[in-house]
Amino acid sequence: MTSQEKVPLQVQLSLPQILSRRDWENPQITQYHRLEAHPPFHSWRDVESAQKDRPSPQQQTLNGLWSFSYFTQPEAVPEHWVRCDLAEAKPLPVPANWQLHGYDAPIYTNIQYPIPVNPPRVPDLNPTGCYSRDFTLEPSWLASGKTRIIFDGVSSAFYLWCNGQWVGYSQDSRLPAEFDLTPYLQAGSNRIAVLVLRWSDGSYLEDQDMWRMSGIFRDVKLLHKPEIHLRDIHIMTHLSPEFTSANLEVMAAVNIPSLQLNDPQVTGSYQLRVQLWLADKLVASLQQPLGTQAIDERGPYTDRTQLVLRIDQPLLWSAEQPTLYRAVVSLLNHQQELIEAEAYDVGFRQVAIHQGLLKINGKAVLIRGVNRHEHHPQTGQAIDEESLLQDILLMKQHNFNAVRCSHYPNHPLWYRLCDRYGLYVVDEANIETHGMQPMSRLSDDPSWFSAFSERVTRMVQRDRNHPCIIIWSLGNESGHGATHDALYRWIKTNDPTRPVQYEGGGANTLATDILCPMYARVDEDQPFPAVPKWSIKKWIGLPNESRPLILCEYAHAMGNSFGGFARYWQAFRQYPRLQGGFIWDWVDQSLTHHNDHGQPYWAYGGDFGDTPNDRQFCMNGLVFPDRSPHPSLYEAQCAQQFFQFSLLSTTPLVINITSEYLFRESDNEQLYWRIMLEGESVLEGSQPLNLSPESSQCYRLAEKLPTLNKPGQLWLNVEIRQPKETPWSPAQHRSAWHQWRLPQPLFSPSSDLTNATAHYAPQLQHNLQLQHDLQLQQDEQHIKVTYQQQCWQFSRQTGRLAQWWVADKPMLLRPLQDQFVRAPLDNDIGISEATHIDPNAWVERWKKAGMYQLQQRCLSLHVDHLSHSVQISAEYGYEFEQEPLLHSHWVYRFDRHGRMTIDVNVRIATSLPAPARIGMCCQLADISPTVEWLGLGPHENYPDRQLAAQYGHWSLPLEQMHTAYIFPSENGLRCNTHTLNYGRWTLTGDFHFGISRYSTQQLMVTSHQHLLEPEEGTWLNIDGFHMGVGGDDSWSPSVHIDDILTRETYQYQICWQYKV
């Protein structure tokens, strides 16, 4: 047969002829000549290699350097490029996004499409990447069988040529495109060419909240299959009601030439064998010929068979105990010789919704989930195994058991790793039309049905053999249309073993088995007109509603956020049908960029000149781009921990521990406990933890509380560690912790802050000598209080402590003064698009009220001589446009020990929105390498985000007191502090503090972390009260009322001392 007889006529079309059809603007054309979807194949030629998952010689990677040429539109590509490289071509790695290699620009938008909305049309100026590479095939490779090329991910559409002949076309950026290259190949050197379009009609279905980039960004490989080969394999497990036995059901289809399909003697000569292995032990085996199961009165499918193996006492798979078997499916010829084998990891597990509860192996599961985009700061959407594994290990270490593939099918290796390490997965179709108006515009349009359908059905066909996948998702934020209902029914018919979820149209349509709202709040209704978001507690109690509720997105972790997260987990544990959710989201989607000096920094929307853009809204992660943790990650870890604690009594000291594991014995846990006195251990111990799943046990720690030789507050700290390393954690990994303030201290602590009875001296005289060298000097401009080498100097004009001298050295660069504002958080700004400003956002309310432009006046200044101290009282008024807004009254007391105690009373006008903080700030001249404190720590914490913080004595380098959020904002607070030591400074009281080299003003005006410049000295913020950070979402005020400063008056007290 001649080459031309082998090749379909279409490949004879020229490049201009192919492009003139504009397939990328036709939603009913999603592919030409692409092979049907199936699970990943390796085509092993021996069973042992398949069973042990060895590299297959039948696969050949095409990753590496390709030749690349860039054009602004496809019509500009020279026709001869399909046969030979262009002179201007340069090497480009595959996989990669070309925008990260100097071509075109990445674009970050959330909702708004990056192109004019005119579906299915896209701009004529359509960036186009022309890839090519040569590869060599030995004659033996081509002697028999078929060769396929597999593209695991190309954005957004592409055409393929081999040796100058057109092979096919495909779109859908996140699923494999596989083509038969057999007719086009030759022994020796071969050339493939790929023309990739940035925009296609598929781009209207890929409007996810992410960087919009393009190119061949996943693996490319060749696969050699025999002429007769396995075409599809579907593996299901069915467990008995008592979970004591299971059936392994394998449905396999074989590719047989069509002329032989109706010949039972031919098809019956091929046999399928399934062998099930547990490690190196063969557990079960079954073999039978094709075409043995009658389908109807006309007989069986002659190219398929179904094998069912019974397994007694199977070891079950769960995220807690991800026990995997290995199923080897072999195709044999009539002589019982192996033609080829495929193999898959198998987990025996059951997913069901029963009595309103999502259950895994009969147990109601609490989803400790997170949304995850495929993102790497250097390589963008090209993710390697090291990065995938890093994410999984971090998730497991921080008590996550589930991940939602937001919002598209992930790299095939992701699912294998989730199978092996144990994470429940929501696999989501690559569909989002958030920028459409209405969102359901395309899902209700029959001409788009094929485009929608293939993205759902091909995902299921590729991924359905993975035990980690417990839920299918129809996509994200695409409204609710007839297409969704049809695809829901398709999944339920083709995979009845898993539920389906879909949030669009209000999270409770007939196209979802699970109520899966996003950003619904615990107790607060959001009654939007078309799709109301009820509080999660209310939602599960609505009439005729019996489905479980699992939030598909919640706790928007944008920047300094995540306030109120613990409230969700209180509700999850209280109401069984509230079964958890998926935090938004895992990683800050920032890309590494370089400034004019070649220095790298983390960039966000707009930094690449990209238009439109949504600025920093891409950075919502629990981890920074390099996977270092945000403080909020610890909050998630603590709230989601699998052990819960309660204090039963103090004499004897008894606690109760409850295991929330459903399947796992606590056979690698050690309980450690300590009784702490003001941060120091006075009694401690440890013992093994032996808890069965879902059980509780009491632990007697001590017969009584210890006798102390000094006063103070006692605390009981407990934590659980894993003595041995696990596949996902190192030895001594801390998995759970808790702390109690014990009911009563053994002594009543003395306080330097208690107001002693004041004995006023006779009339104050200038230059008066007080006891113990405490001196007072006054003139028309200043008031000075001196003690030994220290001098406190007040300005009569401002009423402020203008300077603190020590041995004639100034200690203050900026005076001590009130502080009522903070550098706005993303949650304070309250916007989801760069062009929309929410007038209800906190920052807008503060701006309108004049909080950032307050005019300060000293209303009064009085000096009093007491018997053992000097007292200075000052009143300050703050107004905006002549309207009084705030009034503060400071009382300074200087005592015979060289201490300055400040009592602050603040009164707030009823017309003023609640301030961000009630506190003070100053700029210290000193820079000390270390900060020590007694209070909540060690990481950053805020009034509504302190579940994971513990009271204790902490010490950190100064630079670690600043949290380097990429978009600068208020950060670094430590709450409930009683003592702060910084260099020679000591502060005592009950306060929150933040300390760094950056002022609030600089944080307010700087757009990126790398642009911050350390200032002279150290900025110290002391807060008596601080508003919460919020975090239910980031586009509406989300700080809970309990964490808002709503009172009219506030009072706090601080004692300062400098150790000379």
Swiss-Prot record:
PROSITE patterns (UniProt xref): GLYCOSYL_HYDROL_F2_1 (PS00719), GLYCOSYL_HYDROL_F2_2 (PS00608)
Example GO biological process: lactose catabolic process
Residues that coordinate or bind Mg(2+) 2: 613
tRNA processing as UniProt keyword: no
Cofactor annotation remark: Binds 2 magnesium ions per monomer.
Organism encoding this protein: Yersinia pestis (strain Pestoides F)
Gene3D superfamilies registered for this protein in UniProt: 2.70.98.10, Galactose-binding domain-like, Glycosidases, Immunoglobulins
Cofactor(s) needed for function: Mg(2+); Na(+)
Classification via NCBIfam families: PRK09525.1 (NF007074)
Coiled-coil region list: none
Binding locations of substrate: 110, 209, 477, 553-556, 620, 1035
Swiss-Prot/TrEMBL site (Transition state stabilizer) positions: 373, 407
Chain sites annotated for binding Na(+): 209, 617, 620
Annotated family: Belongs to the glycosyl hydrolase 2 family.
Location of the active site: 477 (proton donor), 553 (nucleophile)
Keywords in alphabetical order: Glycosidase, Hydrolase, Magnesium, Metal-binding, Sodium
Protein name: Beta-galactosidase
SUPFAM superfamilies linked: (Trans)glycosidases, beta-Galactosidase/glucuronidase domain, Galactose mutarotase-like, Galactose-binding domain-like
Catalytic activities: Hydrolysis of terminal non-reducing beta-D-galactose residues in beta-D-galactosides
Class of the enzyme per the UniProt entry, highest EC level: hydrolase
One GO CC term on file: beta-galactosidase complex
InterPro entries noted in UniProt: B-gal_small/dom_5, Bact_Beta-galactosidase, Beta-gal/glucu_dom_sf, Gal_mutarotase_sf_dom, Galactose-bd-like_sf, GH-type_carb-bd, Glyco_hydro_2, Glyco_hydro_2_AS
Residues bound to Mg(2+) 1: 432, 434, 477
Biological classification of the source: Bacteria, Pseudomonadati, Pseudomonadota, Gammaproteobacteria, Enterobacterales
Record carries keyword Magnesium: yes
GO molecular function, one term: carbohydrate binding
EC number in record: 3.2.1.23
Subunit structure: Homotetramer.
